[in-house]
Amino acid sequence: MISEWEKHTLLADTALQLDDPVRSILHYQQALSLSEDISECVEIEADERLLISVISCHNLAQFWRWAGDTEYELKYLQLASEKVLTLIPQCPNQNCASFIDSIGCCTKALIDFMKRHPNPAIAKQVEKIDTATNCEVIAKFRLN
């Protein structure tokens, strides 16, 4: 299934380079459809399933940016964002000073999530940030 997704992604990239937008969008759409099937396949690691899905969304966003359609570009960027947000741990303490409304978690949860980012460059940027001092739930346990 992944090899089929890779095939359609490469065919779409090639078609775009050959200035064949119709063939390109068809293959990008096929790759996105396959990524949805892949996302339900439990035999594949969760990180890999998410990465494939997000790449498919970003490819379509990039295509629509190239085509000059910002509405569709934003639609696919939003879809990618929603897929990533499903992995960020949600925090029940919404009154915490470090809670971020737009993503439903505190700074600690977000940074801890980013420390496990599949892109080592991003993970390295946040690896030394101390997150425990910013979490009110952890602070509550330290006081008691």
Swiss-Prot record:
Protein name (Swiss-Prot/TrEMBL): Uncharacterized protein VP2110
Domain of life: Bacteria
InterPro entries with a match to the protein in the record: Uncharacterised_VP2110
Lineage, opening ranks: Bacteria, Pseudomonadati, Pseudomonadota, Gammaproteobacteria, Vibrionales
Organism whose genome encodes this protein: Vibrio parahaemolyticus serotype O3:K6 (strain RIMD 2210633)
